[in-house]
Amino acid sequence: FPTRRSSDLTALATSGTVYDLSLLDKVTDSQGKTLKEYGSSVVNQMSDVPDNVWNDIHEGMRRVVLTHEQFNGLGVTLSGKTGTAELDIYHPNHGLFIGYTTSSDTSEPEYSIAVRIANGYTSGNACLTANDILKYIYNLADEDTILTGYASSDTSNTSND
């Protein structure tokens, strides 16, 4: 699920450029010598979508992030979408977040992220995880404060958000 959603999200972030999904950038040997590099390849361009529609999507996703306190003070330009998926009345909802960051220099997309927490109760918990991942990627916090070996405090244990 997360890799497929991340790929779809990249198409949104790039205003319609669909890339062949690759999980690897390169392979190196034990001395750091690059053995193989993997480039990205465009498989489709959604050119029939007007610019104003892309702008509305980007603005809407930016506003979603601004309404979630889990991202307050992150220091990274992030746009995203939250969600919950219900299984049944006997199990907690799955918590979901997809998002992308943009470069402060060029406003071009840098990273896409997809978090799914099975039976995670609320999307807020997925937002907390995404926040920690972004702090790690951008070196915004000491690794020891992010990777504690313990779960973060949940945002809510209600299954109806």
Annotate each predicted stretch with a short phrase.
Residues R4-N44, H58-T145:
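Active-site beta-strand/loop architecture of penicillin-binding DD-peptidases
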Residues E143-D161:
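Intrinsically disordered, low-complexity repeat and linker tracts
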Residues Q45-M46, N52:
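Long, compositionally biased intrinsically disordered regions
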Residues N52-N55, Y121, T155-D161:
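Residue-level signal for protein termini and structural transition zones
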